């Protein structure tokens, strides 16, 4: 990974990790954030009535509810257990809240059983739905009041949170990893310290009453990522005296 003329890192977190764990000249490292397409995830996207009718048919328990969503495969470090405690704190004031846990349980059957037992223990059986792995995550996020990122370990980047922000849906996230870097740019008020569940509850209550304004994502875009990638290759080619990418394309 560190043998190239240049090494692209997808976040400051990964830059730090590489420098701390590999012998490499820091000048080789080039930060290039991952990006999302504004055509696929347009700001203020509204789902179709056809999709909504199908959704309510499949999940009637979500009709006329305040939807809070935690996407991500079901595993201990993704924070589904913290999410349940957040929902428990919210329903005291907003009993019409419904939490969606979106993600594949894979081989984590034991943890899934633990989560479902916690749902019963906390009296959340009418307020939580496990909807499994979904291809319509964009639509699900678009009907959500807030999307959560509660991973207990820092993520290299965290694509789902960026997709939500790009749609104009607020994100509450633990303040570490690549997700922190996204929110610093687009919604810094959504950051809370890792494990501070009461802070997540209080911020959720505040945002349900008055949703925050989100900056349009003009920073973490697919086009910008692609252009930056090409620029890295262009620079390497020029430094080696081999012309330019444009000339090579014509060959």
Each model region followed by its residue ranges:
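Conserved donor-binding/catalytic core segment of Leloir-type glycosyltransferases
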Residues: 61-78, 84-87
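A short helix/loop element that forms part of the nucleotide-sugar donor recognition site in Leloir-type
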Residues: 42-61, 115
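A charged, aromatic-enriched C-terminal amphipathic alpha-helix characteristic of glycosyltransferases
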Residues: 211-241
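Acidic donor-binding loop of glycosyltransferase active sites
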Residues: 142-156, 169
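Glycosyltransferase donor-sugar binding loop
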Residues: 36, 71, 98-113
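A short, active-site helix/loop in glycosyltransferases that binds the activated sugar's phosphate group
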Residues: 4-31, 36-40
């Amino acid at each position: 990974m560190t043998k190239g003329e240049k090494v692209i890192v997808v976040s400051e977190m990964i830059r730090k990790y590489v420098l701390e764990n590999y012998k490499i000249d820091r000048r080789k490292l080039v930060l290039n954030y991952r990006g999302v397409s504004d055509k696929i995830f347009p700001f203020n996207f509204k789902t179709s009535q056809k999709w909504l009718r199908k959704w309510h048919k499949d999940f009637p328990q979500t009709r006329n509810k305040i939807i809070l969503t935690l996407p991500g495969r079901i595993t201990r470090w993704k924070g589904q257990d913290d999410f349940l405690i957040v929902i428990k704190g919210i329903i005291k004031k907003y009993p019409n809240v419904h939490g969606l846990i979106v993600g594949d349980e894979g081989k984590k059957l034991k943890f899934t059983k633990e989560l479902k037992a916690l749902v019963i223990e906390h009296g959340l059986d009418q307020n939580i739905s496990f909807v499994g792995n979904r291809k319509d995550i964009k639509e699900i996020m678009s009907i959500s009041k807030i999307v959560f990122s509660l991973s207990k370990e820092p993520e290299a980047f965290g694509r789902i949170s960026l997709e939500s922000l790009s749609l104009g849906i607020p994100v509450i996230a633990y303040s570490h990893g690549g997700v922190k870097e996204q929110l610093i740019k687009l919604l810094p008020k959504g950051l809370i310290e890792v494990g501070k569940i009461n802070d997540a509850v209080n911020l959720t209550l505040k945002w349900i009453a008055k949703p925050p304004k989100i900056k349009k994502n003009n920073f973490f875009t697919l086009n910008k990522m692609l252009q930056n990638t090409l620029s890295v290759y262009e620079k390497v080619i020029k430094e080696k005296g081999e012309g330019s990418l444009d000339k090579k394309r014509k060959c």
